[in-house]
Amino acid sequence: METLYTERLTLRKMELEDADVLCQYWSDPEVTKYMNITPFTDVSQARDMIQMINDLSLEGQANRFSIIVKETDEVIGTCGFNMIDQENGRAEIGYDLGRNHWGKGFASEAVQKLIDYGFTSLNLNRIEAKVEPENTPSIKLLNSLSFQKEGLLRDYEKAKGRLIDVYMFSLLKREYAG
């Protein structure tokens, strides 16, 4: 997995040394509100998550980058592909930031770079995002990056013990301006 760079950010493979700071973010109910995890209570949960995703990355099934601010070398969140379907050239995108980093354009900058990586390096044809209807910030982000809302998937998946509706968004390689 290569390291990616934007004007303000470095996106690199998640490492076990990121567990302490990621545990802080992933233990915040506001950060995990729309993630399919319950808030973490122990750093070992973050270590396990990092190891699981890195194992999936080795198999080409998923990947996740730590998002780092170049100026401060601070890990502020993660982004990546939760599921990669190489046979069909598609992947599901995911992203999260610590609450104190919201509203600064970091998610947009990181996800834009991730999209470029997906279409160029991973040779994807389609990038998908599943978003809960109440997750307005994520919907705004996807709209700003030219994702198309395809529709509502009713009772589509379990999150925190209950079936939820999700919007399906997608961006196709031929639509991507790059």
Swiss-Prot record:
Keywords tagged on the record: Acyltransferase, Transferase
Alphabetized InterPro entries for the sequence: Acyl_CoA_acyltransferase (IPR016181), GNAT_dom (IPR000182), N-acetyltransferase (IPR051531)
Transferase found in the keyword field: yes
EC code: 2.3.1.-
Organism domain of life: Bacteria
Single GO MF annotation: protein-N-terminal-alanine acetyltransferase activity
Stated name of the protein: Uncharacterized N-acetyltransferase p20
Organism this protein belongs to: Bacillus licheniformis
Gene name tied to this protein: p20
